[in-house]
């Protein structure tokens, strides 16, 4: 009996060491973690205990801001709900501030790529908030002649499947 407890405790300790080392490695390798730590420079718009917002160094337009959790989180599925809500509140405040700033933009996009197929390149979750202007030549490609326009019953079936997957 005691041996089993020791093994589990030892496994727990080893798991925590591996988890800690992985987190330390990620903090040293991830460009956004390095920005959070202060080992890389950033033009900071906002910082608190949960998130940080700073200027994108490859902006779509002047005023392009990235909002990130200060803890390393790669994907939306791994993001704490309260931190996610806070992240979006900060992004919303930035979106409201952009048209009031010297840029006086005509619109704002918020964009989050989650996973390789979605175009995620930096695997530290980040929400883009950037000003838009008519004729700024940036846009999401949307094919208006989609090959399949689903019937309502198909949409209902897909909605039910997603609803069941909500946790």
Which residues make up each language-model segment?
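HIT superfamily nucleotide-processing domains
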Residues: 12-167
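Extreme N-terminal basic, low-complexity initiation segments
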Residues: 2-12
